[in-house]
Swiss-Prot record:
This is Defensin-like protein 308. Disulfide bonds join C31-C50, C37-C55, C41-C57. GO terms for biological process: defense response to fungus; killing of cells of another organism. GO terms for cellular component: extracellular region. It comes from Arabidopsis thaliana.
Length: 78
């Protein structure tokens, strides 16, 4: 009985420590607003989003050539 309790305790400790070593924490990316996400993302994202209390660290996608107005293009024909 003591050995099985000891074995379960060892497995519990190993599972917790392995997730800490690998940097996996399921509660760190929880957020209330974009300020919490700015701390969690650790990269420069102008205003990361907090969607369903989970941080979205992806930067906004750049506009494609079709989305850029013709007046904003710098190409000129001579």
């Amino acid at each position: 009985m003591k050995t099985s309790a000891f074995f379960i305790a060892v497995l519990l400790i190993l599972s917790c420590s392995s997730s800490m070593i690998m940097g996996v924490s399921y509660h760190e990316n929880r957020c209330h607003d974009w300020v919490d996400c700015a701390i969690w993302c650790k990269q420069w994202v102008p205003q990361p989003k907090c969607i369903n209390r989970v941080c979205d660290c992806k930067p906004k996608s750049l506009p494609t050539n079709d989305e850029i107005p013709k007046s904003a293009s710098s190409s000129s024909k001579n």
